[in-house]
Amino acid sequence: MPEFLEDPSVLTKDKLKSELVANNVTLPAGEQRKDVYVQLYLQHLTARNRPPLAAGANSKGPPDFSSDEEREPTPVLGSGASVGRGRGAVGRKATKKTDKPRLEDKDDLDVTELSNEELLDQLVRYGVNPGPIVGTTRKLYEKKLLKLREQGTESRSSTPLPTVSSSAENTRQNGSNDSDRYSDNDEDSKIELKLEKREPLKGRAKTPVTLKQRRTEHNQSYSQAGVTETEWTSGSSTGGPLQALTRESTRGSRRTPRKRVETSQHFRIDGAVISESTPIAETIKASSNESLVANRLTGNFKHASSILPITEFSDITRRTPKKPLTRAEVGEKTEERRVDRDILKEMFPYEASTPTGISASCRRPIKGAAGRPLELSDFRMEESFSSKYVPKYAPLADVKSEKTKKRRSVPMWIKMLLFALVAVFLFLVYQAMETNQGNPFTNFLQDTKISN
C-alpha cells in the first residue's frame, strides 16, 4: 500500500491533479485554486495511510490531518483569533472552550522548544523559503513563524475552509483563503492572463464613441465663424449707422434651420445703451446655394425701423471676405504694373512681349538629313533674317584689334622726325664729352677766341 504525503502543499498543482486522477478521485469542474486540491488530497489519499484514531498520537513532528479535522472549520492554532491579537501576543495560552486540546496548541506554545529542522519544516509549510537556521537567526525565524500562524488562525476563523463535494457548489469556489500558505503562484498568474483577454470587448464597445467624435470633428472643420458688420438705422435717430457684430456659423446651414445668438457688446441708439446678452433670433432659410439670415430684434429695438440685412454665403466657406479696394488703390496698382512693364521693355527691347515673359524661336530645319537634297540657298544667309539676341559684352579679340588700329594711327613722318632729333642730340652729347684735339669744332672755337 503506497504511503501518501502528510503535507501535500509541497507538491505543485499539476502534481496534485495527477495524483488525484491516478487514485480515481473526482476533480471539481472548472479551474480551482491549489488549496482545493490539497483538501481533496488530504481527504481521500492521506486518510488511507492509517485509521483516523492514529491522528491523535503524540509526536513532535508536524500535525497530521484527518478527515474529521478537515470537515471542521477549526483553525490550525488554538490561540489568538478568538481571544484577540493582544492576548495572543502576550502569552498565546488562551484557548476556546469549545476547542479540544491538540498537538497544534502545544506547538504554538513551544515554538522555542522546536529543533532547527522542525522550525525549518514549519516555515516551509507556510510557503517561506528560509536560509540556514543558526543561533543568531533562530529568533528571527521564530517571530516570523508566530506571525504566520496568527495570520492563518485569523483567516481560518473568519472564513471556514470549503468542504469538497461533487455538487455544483464546487464550481463557485475560488479559494481566496490562505493564499500566503502556498508558494505556487505561477498558476494564479495564468488565471489573470485569461481574464485580461476580455479587454478587446471593451475596445469594440468604445468604437462608436470614437466614430461619433470623428464625425463631429469632421463637421466642425467645415465651420468657420466669420464676423460681419451690419448697419442698423433707427427711425428716430439722427446719428450715424449702428454697427452690430453678428457671428454667422456656416456649419450645418442645411441641418439646423434656426439658431439663437446672443450679442455680448454694448450698442448705443440715441443715447440709450443696450445691455449685454440681448437675444437675437436668427431665422436661417436654407436653399441650394445661399441662405437668408433675418435678424429680429426684441425689447429695446421696438422703436427701430424694419431691418432685414441679407447675407449670402455658401454652405462651406473657407475664405474670409476681402475688403473692397478703393479707386485710388486700384489706380496705384495699375501704375505699378505699367512701370514694371516699361522696365522690362527697357531691359529687353528686342524681346517679344508675352504674357509669361518667355519667348522662343522656331528651330531651323536640318538640311541634308534623312536623305534630303542639299541646295545652294541653304548656305546663303537670308537678308530677312534678324537676330533678336543683343550681346552685352564684346569678345576679347575685338578689343585687341581696336588697340592695334589705334597704335597704327600715328603717321610715319612724325616717327622719322623724332628719330632724327634723338640721333642728333646723342651725337652732340658724345662730342662734348671727348677731350682729344681731334675735335672737329676746334677751328670754330679758335676763330671765336680771336675775334674777341
From Swiss-Prot:
Q: Name one GO biological process term.
A: regulation of DNA-templated transcription
Compositionally skewed regions (Basic and acidic residues) per UniProt: 96-105, 178-202
Q: How is it modified after translation?
A: Mitosis-specific phosphorylation specifically abolishes its binding to lamin B and chromosomes. Citrullinated by PADI4.
Q: Which PROSITE patterns match?
A: LEM, LEM_LIKE
Q: Name one GO molecular function term.
A: DNA binding
Q: Which species?
A: Mus musculus
SMART domains registered for this protein in UniProt: LEM, Thymopoietin
Could you tell me the keywords of this UniProt record? Acetylation, Chromosome, Citrullination, DNA-binding, Isopeptide bond, Membrane, Methylation, Nucleus, Phosphoprotein, Signal-anchor, Transmembrane, Transmembrane helix, Ubl conjugation
Q: Share the domain note from the entry.
A: Has two structurally independent, non-interacting domains: LEM-like (also called LAP2-N or LEM-D) and LEM (also called LAP2-C or LEM-B). LEM-like binds DNA while LEM interacts with BANF1.
Region described as Linker: spans on this chain: 49-108
Question: What's the stated role of this polypeptide?
Answer: May help direct the assembly of the nuclear lamina and thereby help maintain the structural organization of the nuclear envelope. Possible receptor for attachment of lamin filaments to the inner nuclear membrane. May be involved in the control of initiation of DNA replication through its interaction with NAKAP95.
For this UniProt entry, what's an example GO CC term?
nuclear envelope
**According to its record, how does it sit in the membrane?**
Single-pass type II membrane protein
| Annotated protein name in UniProt | Lamina-associated polypeptide 2, isoforms beta/delta/epsilon/gamma
Q: List the disulfide bonds.
A: none
Region ranges (NAKAP95-binding N): 137-242
Q: Give the LEM domain ranges.
A: 109-153
**Covalent cross-link (Glycyl lysine isopeptide (Lys-Gly) (interchain with G-Cter in SUMO2)), residues:** K400
The protein's gene is named Tmpo
InterPro entries in UniProt = LEM-like_dom (IPR013146), LEM/LEM-like_dom_sf (IPR011015), LEM_dom (IPR003887), LEM_domain (IPR051656)
